From Swiss-Prot:
Functional pathway: Phospholipid metabolism; phosphatidylethanolamine biosynthesis; phosphatidylethanolamine from CDP-diacylglycerol: step 2/2
Site (Cleavage (non-hydrolytic)): G256, S257
Manner of cofactor binding, per the entry note: Binds 1 pyruvoyl group covalently per subunit.
Protein name: Phosphatidylserine decarboxylase proenzyme
GO biological process assignments: phosphatidylethanolamine biosynthetic process
Compartments (UniProt record): Cell membrane
Residues the record lists as Pyruvic acid (Ser) modifications: S257
UniProt cross-references to InterPro entries, sorted A to Z: PS_Dcarbxylase, PSD-B, PSD_type1_pro
UniProt organism field: Haemophilus influenzae (strain 86-028NP)
UniProt keyword list: Cell membrane, Decarboxylase, Lipid biosynthesis, Lipid metabolism, Lyase, Membrane, Phospholipid biosynthesis, Phospholipid metabolism, Pyruvate, Zymogen
Active site: D96 (charge relay system), H153 (charge relay system), S257 (charge relay system), S257 (schiff-base intermediate with substrate)
Length: 290
């Protein structure tokens, strides 16, 4: 017999499949960029209260300092609010949030949630070279909730080699949905960033979601919108190479979503404190060099 709780769970999942994801995200994006003065400030205050957002660490601590929701979503933090671990053999976490999953890549399969796996081929848009690069490697998936800091930083010093935009769905990526929507992260819109580092090749993926109005990077600006219907690739070589330092900002979400990191086999050892649903902060240790 189906309980009322399981009924509502199934209803939530079913709604994700039938709702107009892109249309709702476009509407949310339009509202988020409006500058309505006191109305905007009132709504921001209500949002911050609902999600218990700590404004004491923001550079701008007053709600009236933000002209739009978008400004509030990507609010920068005070200097040293997130100290970067300076151990030269360690990589640091790229974002505030919670660990959705982490661990070993079994040949080409990553764990999405208990009982659900997805493949490197699907996640990396069938880029054969990248798929081979990360077989039997390590991965970490970090979920950014609406209450979290929405900027994404570098785990280590790196040189950007390639960026790939992959069109897709806009399912919610919260841990509940990750248990029920197959192939969730590999079917959603995403931006794949490929870096050369002293820890081997590293990928950092910014995954879109429902009402994530835009994803941006510090070197290319806003990647979406507009949304595209085909995979787009940018390469960075020679004078166009982009060098980033450990802890440096590399991108942002308007509103929060998910970051996935991939590491080559036998290059890193994930930090012992990483566990599912564990709250984490940008700058804390993610992994160590093997």
């Amino acid at each position: 017999m189906m309980t009322s709780n399981s009924y509502w769970q199934r209803l939530k999942v079913a709604f994700q499949y039938v709702m107009p994801q892109i249309y709702l995200t476009q509407i949310a994006g339009w509202f988020a960029k409006q500058k309505w003065g006191k109305i905007t400030h009132f709504v921001i205050k209500a949002f911050a209260k609902k999600y218990n957002i700590d404004m004491s660490i923001a550079q701008k601590g007053q709600f009236s300092d933000y002209a739009s929701f978008n400004e509030f979503f990507i609010r920068p933090l005070k200097e040293n609010a997130r100290p970067i671990n300076q151990n030269p053999t360690a990589l640091c976490l790229p974002a505030d949030g919670r660990i959705s999953e982490c661990g070993h890549i079994d040949d080409n399969l990553l764990l999405q949630a208990k009982g659900h796996f997805f493949s490197l081929e699907d996640l990396l848009a069938e880029d054969k070279e990248l798929v081979e690069t990360f077989k039997n490697g390590e991965f970490v998936t970090t979920y950014l909730s609406p209450r979290d800091y929405h900027r994404v930083h570098m785990p280590c010093d790196a040189t950007l080699r390639k960026m790939i935009y992959v069109p897709g769905d806009l399912f919610s990526v919260n841990p509940f949905l990750a248990q029920y929507v197959p192939n969730l992260f590999a079917r959603n819109e995403r931006v794949i960033c490929v870096f050369d580092t002293e820890f081997g090749t590293m990928v950092q993926i910014l995954v879109g979601a429902t009402i994530t109005a835009s994803i941006g990077t510090t070197w290319a600006g806003v990647i979406n919108p507009p949304r595209h219907n085909e995979v787009k690739t940018w390469t960075y070589e020679g004078e166009s190479a982009v060098k980033l330092l450990k802890g440096q900002e590399m991108g942002w979400f308007q509103l929060g979503s998910t970051v996935i990191n991939l590491f080559q086999a036998n290059q890193v050892r994930l930090a012992d404190h990483l566990s599912v649903n564990e709250p984490v902060r940008m700058g804390e240790i993610l992994a160590y060099k093997k």
